[in-house]
Design a protein with these regions (language model features):
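Extracytoplasmic gate region of multi-pass secondary transporters
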Residues: 43-44, 248-297, 390-394
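Extracellular/periplasmic helix-loop-helix junction of adjacent transmembrane segments
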Residues: 46-79
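Cytoplasmic membrane-interface "Motif A"-like loop-to-helix N-cap segments
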Residues: 92-103, 310-322
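C-terminal ends and interior cores of transmembrane alpha-helices
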Residues: 104-123, 323-338
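Glycine-rich segments within core transmembrane alpha-helices of 12-TM secondary carriers
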Residues: 163-184, 382-394
Length: 437
């Protein structure tokens, strides 16, 4: 019997570990979806209605949209602050505590946007309040991504980390699908009612999503890697400063990797709605295409994550960055056909192929660049500083280019530049995958 006991114990331990990991994955994905719903609902509203509701009327409707995306970019400027604050909390007090606070702040800010008066009702106070709440959203989202990724990747077996870490991004896709779906439902209202009050519904509905998300996060177990570091007395008193001191190159690499991934994503998923209006494509067609593309990408990113466990992180990420450059012009060619199937194809290729290969690999890749005691701070700092220039500025630059040239080709060239920055970064980034024994 003595010889059987170790085998029985190991099986029980493996089953318990598998159940715990599954619970962490499900809870993390659900919590991430709740938070990213709040974040993406602003991006959709900025593309569709915020320009005419919160900014002075002008002869060129793109000017109002430009103002809405400027407020969108301000949220990204606040993200590094969130990365520093919540990275410190996550490395000092645990990933779980940080994630609960990010969701609380995001929920309050998003619900508040749904209560704001418009420019016609309150004048300049309206865009000022919008910017203030957008800043709060930015602070919360700055601490969200790194924590959500690490909760899964730090509990996953090394040989399957790419696959499991990719699951964290399903929350991002899920939040986007939920927010776009909410706006599709709201747009079923007559246009006048949608502009008068219907646009508020997706923001006000976030209170239900927010409450569920807090409950889910509060009941998450702590990261296994963090608990081991804490028990060994290896937590840092000043993790952000230590990350900068010990991992300056890795932080720069994380920033460069983010440029094509984040910048491309917001051009495909946010700016495309603006371009659709410019090109005379029905907004319902564009929203449907975006939702379809995100659903397809949610499955694709898992496949890319698994492939990164087999081939390595760098080759898979390179596929995405190079594909982004290749798709820069064909993406708009397909949109300009005004054919719904070809529009759907453009969005699916842009997201599932180009962006999917990068976002499916990024969580494991950047997490493996940093040591446990400063990992949250290092990941958050590199990820969120890049967000200012990539996600925050990309749709703003794209709208400005479209407004000035009234053509898509400058935006295509800009997409190619984003891809080139990441390709060069990959050439200087070390492979982090641990080969299977």
């Amino acid at each position: 019997m003595a010889s059987v006991q170790p085998s029985t114990t190991s099986i029980a331990t493996a089953v318990s570990y598998s159940k715990t990991l599954t619970r962490i994955v499900v809870a993390s994905v659900a919590g991430n979806a709740m938070e990213w719903y709040d974040f993406f609902v602003y991006g959709t509203a900025a593309a569709l209605v915020f320009g005419q509701l919160f900014f002075p009327a002008t002869a060129d409707p793109l000017i109002g949209t430009l103002g809405a995306f400027a407020a969108f970019a301000i949220g990204f400027v606040a993200r590094p602050l969130g990365g520093i604050v919540f990275g410190h909390i996550g490395d000092r007090h645990g990933r779980k505590a940080s994630l609960v606070w990010t969701l609380l702040i995001m929920g309050v800010a998003t619900f508040g946007i749904g209560l704001l008066p418009t420019y016609a009702q309150a004048g300049l106070w309206s865009p000022a309040a919008l910017v203030a709440l957008r800043l709060l959203q930015g602070v919360a989202s700055g601490g969200e991504w790194g924590g959500g990724v690490l909760m899964i990747s730090e509990n996953a077996p090394p040989e399957k980390r790419g696959y499991y870490a990719a699951w964290s991004q399903l929350g991002v896709g899920g939040g986007f699908v939920l927010s776009s779906g909410a706006f599709l439902a709201a747009q079923a209202l007559p246009h006048a009612q949608f502009l008068a009050w219907g646009w508020r519904l997706p923001f006000l509905a976030s209170v239900l999503i927010f409450a569920l998300g807090v409950y889910i996060r509060y009941n998450l177990p702590e990261s296994r890697d963090f608990e081991n570091a804490e028990q060994a007395g290896k937590t840092s008193h000043m993790p952000v400063l230590e990350a900068i001191k010990r991992h300056p190159k890795e932080i720069l690499m994380a920033m460069g990797l983010r440029v094509a991934e984040n910048g491309g994503a917001y051009i495909f998923l946010a700016f495309s709605l603006v371009y659709g209006k410019f090109a005379g494509i029905a907004s319902s067609t564009m929203l449907t295409a975006v939702v379809l593309a995100m659903v397809v990408e949610m499955g694709a990113m898992l496949a890319w994550g698994r492939l990164s466990d087999k081939l390595g992180r760098k080759p898979v990420y390179m596929i995405g960055a190079v594909s982004l450059m290749v798709m820069a012009f064909p993406f708009f060619w397909l949109l300009n056909t005004h054919s719904s199937p070809l529009i759907y194809l453009a969005l699916v290729l842009g997201t599932a192929l180009c962006h999917g290969a990068m976002i499916g690999t990024l969580p494991a890749l950047v997490g493996e660049l940093f040591s446990t005691e400063v990992r949250y701070s290092g990941v958050a700092l590199g990820h969120e500083v890049a967000s200012i220039f990539a996600g925050g500025m990309s749709p703003l630059i794209a709208v400005a280019l479209l407004s000035h040239y009234h053509a898509y080709w400058p935006v295509s060239l800009f997409l190619m530049l984003l891809g080139l920055v990441t390709v060069v970064t990959l050439c200087f980034t070390r492979e982090t995958r641990i080969p299977s024994p």
